[in-house]
């Protein structure tokens, strides 16, 4: 009796974990990753406070920062007075986050785990927040369903991301010029090559338009969806970017919020 050899499925989550492990030590130096200036910090504070104020509660909000990475947003949220838990796939990213939280004396819970397979009970949080995560996920719809599951009725899912590959001849030209300048002026990154290999497994690698994120949040069962342009964040980020990075900076980054039905 003959047997048919089967090809094992690639461990996509393991590959993603290794990519972010590799980037952990220098991740915050990238514009748009770490919060680099006071102007940027306060721009985020205003935006998040306006979003989270939509959630009614008599106690400090319980917030999950999913895909927290090195903890830049986790610590900002903690400094705003919220009870925050950070979760990330990468243990090296979490190690950086843990060191920074301890250095600042912030009471943050940090856990390793997958964004599409959360280790929490239904309704465990008032808010689930993510920044620059959705585009990195092999199963973004499943992840959004999980985020809605662990958010209590009347709570909020808040997603911040961007339209990284906005169509149109102008943006294609800007990306080409910006990429060429980075190739000359910046040290080549091994992570970039690893990302190119992963890209076919990431359905949202090019980002999402404001119309697309509305569809995804609606599909996850959320309601009262609001999408806000993050132009104040982009303006603050530019102040700490080298000039060649301005050229292909995404023209539309956003924060989208949706409420879990009561």
Where are these regions (language model features)?
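Core SAM-dependent methyltransferase catalytic element
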Residues: 220, 240-262
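Class I SAM-dependent methyltransferase SAM/SAH-binding core
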Residues: 62-66, 70-117
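A short glycine-rich, Lys/Arg-flanked "PGG" loop and its adjoining helix->strand segment in the class I
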Residues: 141-153
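Short alpha-helix
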Residues: 203-221
């Amino acid at each position: 009796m003959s047997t048919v050899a089967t090809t094992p499925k690639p461990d996509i989550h393991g590959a993603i974990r290794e990519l972010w492990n590799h980037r952990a030590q220098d991740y915050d130096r990238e514009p748009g990753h770490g919060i680099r200036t006071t102007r940027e910090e306060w721009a985020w504070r205003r935006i998040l406070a306006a979003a989270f104020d939509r959630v009614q509660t008599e106690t400090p909000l319980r917030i999950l920062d999913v895909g927290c990475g090195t903890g830049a947003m986790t610590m900002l949220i903690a400094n705003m007075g919220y009870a925050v838990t950070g979760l990330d796939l990468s243990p090296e990213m979490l190690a950086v986050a843990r060191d920074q939280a301890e250095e600042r004396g912030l009471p943050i819970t940090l856990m390793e785990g997958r964004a599409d397979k959360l280790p929490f009970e239904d309704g465990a949080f008032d808010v689930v927040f993510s920044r620059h995560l959705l585009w990195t996920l092999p199963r973004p719809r499943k992840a959004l369903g999980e985020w809605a599951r662990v958010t209590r009725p009347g709570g909020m899912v808040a997603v911040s991301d961007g339209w990284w590959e906005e169509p149109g001849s102008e943006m294609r030209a800007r990306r080409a010029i910006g990429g060429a300048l980075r190739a000359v002026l910046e040290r080549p990154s091994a992570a970039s090559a690893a990302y190119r290999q992963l890209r076919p497994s990431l359905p949202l690698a090019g980002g999402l338009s404001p119309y697309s994120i509305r569809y995804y949040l609606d599909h996850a069962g959320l309601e009262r969806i609001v999408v806000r342009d993050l132009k104040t964040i982009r303006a603050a980020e530019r102040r700490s970017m080298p000039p060649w990075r301005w050229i292909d900076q995404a023209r539309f980054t956003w924060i989208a919020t949706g409420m879990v039905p009561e």
